[in-house]
From Swiss-Prot:
Homology family: Belongs to the selenophosphate synthase 1 family. Class I subfamily.
Protein name per Swiss-Prot or TrEMBL: Selenide, water dikinase
Task performed by this protein: Synthesizes selenophosphate from selenide and ATP.
Lineage start: Bacteria, Pseudomonadati, Thermodesulfobacteriota, Desulfuromonadia, Geobacterales
UniProt-annotated catalytic positions: U16
A single GO cellular-component term on record: cytoplasm
Pfam families: AIRS, AIRS_C
Subunit annotation: Homodimer.
Key word Lyase present: no
HAMAP family linked: SelD
Keywords: ATP-binding, Kinase, Magnesium, Metal-binding, Nucleotide-binding, Selenium, Selenocysteine, Transferase
EC numbers, comma separated: 2.7.9.3
Cofactor: Mg(2+)
Binding site for Mg(2+): D49, D89, D225
Length: 343
C-alpha cells in the first residue's frame, strides 16, 4: 500500500529546504543577463516569483517552475503540496494559472510505480481545483524523489503585482502562518504529534488562489510568496527591491502552534540556518531563537503583501468574510538602517 511508504526517509532534505541556499544561488546566476526582447516585462534580473511576457496589448504569459522533495510521507498529499507550491508563484504575481506540465524525478528501483501514480494524482487534484489544465510532463529516473510543475498563467500586463514596489506608509499582510519546514523536519524524524502534522499539512495543501484574487481586487502595491528563503529572506527581497524598510511586529507574525517546542527539541532544518547566515545582516531589533521560524524555509507558504492602509483594511475585512486567514504584521517605512526592523 502506498500509504505505508515513508517518502521523507528517502531524501536528504524536505520540501523547499532542499533548495540551493541564497548565497549559492546568487553566485550561480550572477552572470545571467536579461533578454532585450521588448515584450519581456519581468525577467531574470530581479528576485521576482515568475517571468512575465507580453503577447498582446492586454494579455501576458506568466511562466514559472518549481520542484521539491517530499516533506510528508503520503504520496498523494506530497503531489498536491508540490503542485500548490508551484502554482503559488503565478498567484503571487496576480496571475491565473491555465496550463501545467509534470516534472517527476523518480527512484524506480526502490519505489513501486503506484507511488508515482499517487503523486501525479495529487498534483492533478490541485490543478483541477486551480482550474488549470495538465498538458504533459517529463520523468527522469533518479536516486532521490522529486516532483513539481512547470506552470503557465495569464495576466493583464497592467495588473502585474511585483515584489519590488512597496511604498512607505503601506501595511504588511501575510496569509498563512510559518513553520512548515520545521514541522517537516519533525515528520522526517518521526518526532511530531499527529495533530501538528495534520495542521501543517493542511496549510501546505491550501492554494493561494483565493487570497491572490482578493489581493488584486484590493489593489496590492507589492507581493511575493513565502517559500524557500523563509519569511525574512523574502521580506528582505521586497524591502531591498523597493528601497524601503519593513518594520515588523514580531508578536503579530503568525507561527503554527507547536513549532517553538520543536525548535527547543532541535528539529530545525539546515536550510533555516543557511537562511539565517545569509540574511541576518539585514535584520535589526530582535535576534536569536525567536526569529528561527521566520528563517524557516516554507513550502507552499502564504502570500506576503503590502497595501495602502485603507486597502489593507478592506483586504482584512473581506478575507474574514470569505474565511481566509490574514494577519497585518507591520508597516513599510522609508529606508533607514536595515531592510527589516523587528519590534
Amino acid at each position: 500500500m502506498t500509504d505505508k511508504v515513508r517518502l521523507t526517509t528517502m531524501v536528504q532534505a524536505a520540501g523547499u529546504a532542499a533548495k540551493l541556499g541564497p548565497a549559492g544561488l546568487e553566485e550561480a546566476i550572477h552572470d545571467i543577463t536579461r533578454s532585450d526582447d521588448p515584450n519581456l516585462i519581468v525577467g531574470v534580473e530581479g528576485a521576482e516569483d515568475a517571468g512575465i511576457y507580453r503577447i498582446g496589448d492586454n494579455l501576458a504569459l506568466v511562466e514559472t517552475t518549481d520542484i521539491i522533495t517530499p516533506l510528508v510521507d503520503d504520496p498523494f498529499t506530497f503531489g498536491r503540496i508540490a503542485a500548490a507550491n508551484a502554482l503559488s508563484d503565478v498567484y503571487a504575481m496576480g496571475g491565473r494559472p491555465v496550463t501545467a506540465m509534470n516534472l517527476a524525478f523518480f527512484p524506480a528501483c526502490s519505489l513501486p510505480t503506484k507511488v508515482l501514480a499517487a503523486i501525479l494524482a495529487g498534483g492533478s487534484d490541485a490543478l483541477k481545483e486551480a482550474g488549470a489544465c495538465l498538458v504533459g510532463g517529463h520523468t527522469v529516473e533518479d536516486n532521490e524523489l522529486k516532483f513539481g510543475l512547470a506552470v503557465t498563467g495569464l495576466i493583464d500586463p497592467a495588473r502585474v503585482v511585483r515584489n519590488c514596489t512597496a511604498r512607505p506608509g503601506d501595511l504588511i499582510v501575510i496569509t498563512k502562518p510559518l513553520g512548515t519546514g520545521i514541522v517537516s523536519t519533525a515528520i522526517k524524524a518521526e518526532m511530531v504529534e499527529p495533530v501538528l502534522e495534520a495542521e501543517a499539512t493542511r496549510w501546505m495543501t491550501i492554494l493561494n488562489a483565493q487570497a491572490a484574487e482578493l489581493m488584486v481586487a484590493c489593489r496590492a502595491t507589492a507581493a511575493t510568496d513565502v517559500t524557500g528563503f523563509g519569511f525574512i529572506g523574502h521580506a528582505c527581497e521586497m524591502a531591498l527591491g523597493a528601497k524601503v524598510t519593513f518594520r515588523i511586529e514580531l508578536a503579530r507574525v503568525p507561527v503554527i502552534p507547536g513549532v517553538p517546542a520543536l525548535i527547543d527539541d532541535g528539529l530545525v532544518p539546515a536550510g533555516c540556518y543557511r537562511n539565517r547566515q545569509h540574511y541576518e545582516q539585514h535584520v535589526s531589533g530582535k535576534s536569536g531563537d525567536p526569529l528561527l521560524p521566520l528563517f524557516d524555509p516554507q513550502t507552499s507558504g502564504g502570500l506576503l503583501i503590502t497595501f495602502a492602509p485603507d486597502d489593507a483594511r478592506t483586504f482584512l475585512s473581506r478575507a474574514g468574510e470569505e474565511g481566509l486567514f490574514a494577519a497585518c504584521i507591520g508597516e513599510v517605512e522609508p529606508a533607514g538602517g536595515t531592510p527589516l526592523v523587528f519590534v
